[in-house]
């Protein structure tokens, strides 16, 4: 039932989404673009793509948060990039960074603004909600989700892209599609270099 609703584009705010469903939404938006660029799907549970360049592999993948989807605050995912000598996600890498490392200042500003817009649209739980009736630390931790990000993200921020409904996932995927093309283009150039790139792990 959930997958049928997802394919019809009818996931609404607060409606639980599994990571597999999130990956399917993203895949529908980006797969043809990267297939045309010579990328193949990686193995495993996460949504990833790889391309062999000489004896190197350029890889990128999407990874949902390990925390379960919350009715009020949704969930998050990140995007990671890797240049390695094998096609396995998370294998020993020559270069590996999450998305923030490669973003421009304008992109960082946009993502910060987008996160704040999503937070503004999140419903607040009733006073009898379980997490609000635990310790003060847990209550503060949960309510922090509703506080606006005051400082613009930077290249060292571990950016997690929040979603509370299917619309958010689609918008993130559309926004990052061309950014990912730019980043993998840089990694492809490194892979085509005659000399082995310096090892850089982020």
Over which residues does each language-model region extend?
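Intrinsically disordered, low-complexity regulatory regions enriched in serine/threonine/proline
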Residues: 3, 7-29, 41-43, 48-202
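Acidic, metal-coordinating catalytic segment for phosphate/diphosphate chemistry
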Residues: 34
């Amino acid at each position: 039932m959930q997958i049928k609703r997802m394919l019809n584009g009818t996931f609404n705010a607060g409606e639980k989404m599994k990571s597999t469903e999130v990956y399917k939404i993203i895949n529908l938006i980006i797969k043809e673009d990267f297939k045309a660029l010579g990328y193949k799907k990686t193995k495993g549970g996460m949504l990833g793509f790889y391309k062999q360049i000489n004896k190197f592999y350029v890889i990128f993948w999407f990874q949902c948060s390990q925390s379960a989807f919350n009715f009020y605050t949704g969930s998050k995912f990140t995007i990671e990039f890797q240049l390695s000598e094998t096609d396995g996600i998370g294998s020993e890498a020559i270069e590996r960074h999450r998305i923030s490392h490669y973003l421009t200042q304008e992109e960082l500003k946009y993502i910060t603004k987008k996160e704040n817009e999503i937070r503004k649209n999140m419903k607040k739980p009733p006073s009898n909600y379980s997490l609000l009736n635990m310790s003060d630390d847990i209550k503060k931790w949960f309510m922090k989700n509703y506080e606006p990000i005051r400082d613009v993200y930077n290249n060292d921020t571990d950016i997690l892209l929040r979603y509370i409904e299917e619309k958010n996932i689609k918008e993130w995927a559309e926004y990052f599609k061309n950014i990912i093309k730019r980043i993998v283009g840089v990694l492809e150039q490194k892979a085509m270099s005659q000399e082995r790139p310096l090892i850089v792990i982020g």
